[in-house]
Swiss-Prot record:
GO terms for cellular component: cytosol; mitochondrion. This is ATP-dependent (S)-NAD(P)H-hydrate dehydratase. InterPro entries: Carbohydrate_kinase_pred_CS, CARKD, Ribokinase-like. It comes from Drosophila melanogaster. It holds the Pfam family Carb_kinase. PROSITE patterns: YJEF_C_1, YJEF_C_3. PANTHER family: ATP-DEPENDENT (S)-NAD(P)H-HYDRATE DEHYDRATASE, ATP-DEPENDENT (S)-NAD(P)H-HYDRATE DEHYDRATASE FAMILY MEMBER. ATP binds at residues 198-202, 219-228. Keywords: ATP-binding, Lyase, NAD, NADP, Nucleotide-binding, Phosphoprotein. Catalyzes the dehydration of the S-form of NAD(P)HX at the expense of ATP, which is converted to ADP. Together with NAD(P)HX epimerase, which catalyzes the epimerization of the S- and R-forms, the enzyme allows the repair of both epimers of NAD(P)HX, a damaged form of NAD(P)H that is a result of enzymatic or heat-dependent hydration. Its EC number is 4.2.1.93. (6S)-NADPHX binds at residues 114, 167-173, 229.
Amino acid sequence: MAAVSDIPVHLPKLLALFKTVVPKLVNNKHKGQYGRIGVIGGSLEYTGAPYFAAISSIRVGADLAHVFCHSNASAIIKSYSPDLIVHPVLDCVDAVERIAPWLERLHVVVIGPGLGREPGILKTASNVLKLCMDTKKPVVIDADGLFLLNDNLNLICGQPNVILTPNVMEFQRLFGEDDQAARQKMSLLGAGVTVLEKGANDKIYLPHCNEVHSMPSGGSGRRCGGQGDLLSGSLATFFSWSLQSGEPNPALVAACASSYFVKKLNAAAFQKFGRSLLASDMVNQIPSVFQTEFENSDPQ
């Protein structure tokens, strides 16, 4: 294999580039044009994950967020926020048929937050993923969505506009612990698949060209449940904007921006709450951190 190029991300350049991707707020747009995001996930045990993914997607600026969850989780997720559209369908026998018409309207779909490991639900999620691949729907795959790929990586090989967001352990389960073997396996993914490996220093892999873009460290020493869901949700919105803007490297730009953004959220919340920091505290930092880091000086 060709040598891997490890490219440190130049933050000033990234921030300047992403500001051109963020859509300007104008009065002649209608609801939905700034982003319609779907989240496939949510079970009785895991209701927070899909909520955090969906709420972060609209907090950063998408107009609408849909959560497609198990019926047992629906009322709980609805109680967290009236701003989310919740569909209790994942355990229905005709779940895919019910979800399909909504998929046509969505810009990006996040598969995995709070999905759980129930075989029937995993099968439904797998079929939804296949439908997304068949229709070339951009997807972000996280958490239990990555579990689906452990033995079925071919589901996404050669597909366009796919971003995986594994943590270190999920990355090793997908691609192995040996660096060379992992690069070899990733090379089969194709040019349309991007891998964002989360860690102290996030890494964004472009397997087709043997590039690894390394993000600087950031955030704090406090790790709390839900932070990865904030990343997948904000990433989905950033991805939709990058695609709509015509940016030539939409997945790379969105992945770098979301990695940087979530670490900034963590740092801002840690300043206020320290060891007591929770994911909900990070959600509350989204408006101020986004304004400081990404907002154009002239919103009009």
